[in-house]
A protein has these predicted regions:
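Short, well-ordered alpha-helix to beta-strand connector turns
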Residues: 65, 144-145
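Aromatic-lined carbohydrate-recognition surfaces of secreted/lumenal glycan-active proteins
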Residues: 4-14, 69-72, 93-134, 148-152, ...
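Acidic (Asp/Glu)-rich catalytic clusters
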Residues: 1-2, 136-144, 161-169
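Alpha-helix N-cap and loop-to-helix initiation/capping positions
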Residues: 44-48, 52, 87-99, 132-135
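Active-site-proximal loop/short-helix segments
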Residues: 15, 20-23, 66-97
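An active-site-proximal structural segment forming one wall of the substrate-binding cleft
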Residues: 41-73, 136-139
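Active-site-adjacent "subsite" loops/lids of carbohydrate-active enzymes
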Residues: 12-58
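Short, electropositive alpha-helical surface patch
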Residues: 19, 25-28, 123-144
Length: 188
């Protein structure tokens, strides 16, 4: 009692999926599958990728998890080519939000029926300087129940939520290497 069973799914960086199904891989300027130090990237615009993530979420809910954390819901820093034609006016934030909204809408009924939360893991930069990878705290809080953020400065970070009138004890899950009293946290 008092424990939450969570599962984490890495979304945009999936070397195995990109290798097994090259049709879903992002492409570099030469047309080769895009790979960086993180691994092989898949195209979150691609319906097959979204369906794959949605099916993983559905399977995890059937197994009884209380919360699903989607990590690496982001766009690479490099310029890439997508697996399908998209409007040129769409930016990196649209890349992340389109995926996030589509996944949420597809699994929302099952999540409500099973009382499961959908969260996103984001880098600490989302709280402070912002990111160039398409992740936005304001946008993600419209889709995800909570944000999991790696931090060593919880006492400094929590006010960033309260300034925006967001309950940091409910919407901000710090991931730390040490424990503290109260709230939700993930310990590495």
């Amino acid at each position: 009692q008092g424990w939450t069973i969570t599962a984490e799914i890495c979304c945009a960086v999936d070397t195995l999926l990109a290798s097994a199904n090259p049709d879903v891989a992002l492409r570099d300027r030469t047309g080769a599958p895009y790979v960086d130090e993180s691994g092989g990237w898949v195209d979150l615009w691609n319906r097959d990728v979204r369906t794959y993530i949605e099916e993983l979420c559905t399977d995890l809910m059937a197994m009884g998890v209380d919360e699903i954390i989607l990590s690496r819901v982001e766009h690479p820093f490099a310029e890439v080519m997508y697996t399908r034609e998209i409007a040129s006016s769409l930016n990196r934030e649209a890349f992340c939000m389109n995926f996030s909204i589509a996944v949420r809408e597809e699994i929302d009924k099952t999540m409500k029926d099973k009382n499961v939360h959908l969260s996103a893991r984001v880098p600490h930069d989302v709280l402070t300087t912002g990111t160039d990878n398409g992740q936005s705290m304001d946008n993600f809080l419209k889709v995800y129940d909570r944000l999991v953020i790696e931090t060593e400065t919880y006492s400094d970070d929590a006010p960033l939520f309260t300034e925006k009138k967001i309950d940091s004890t409910l919407r901000f899950v710090p991931q730390m290497t040490w424990t503290f009293g109260g709230g939700s946290w993930i310990l590495d």
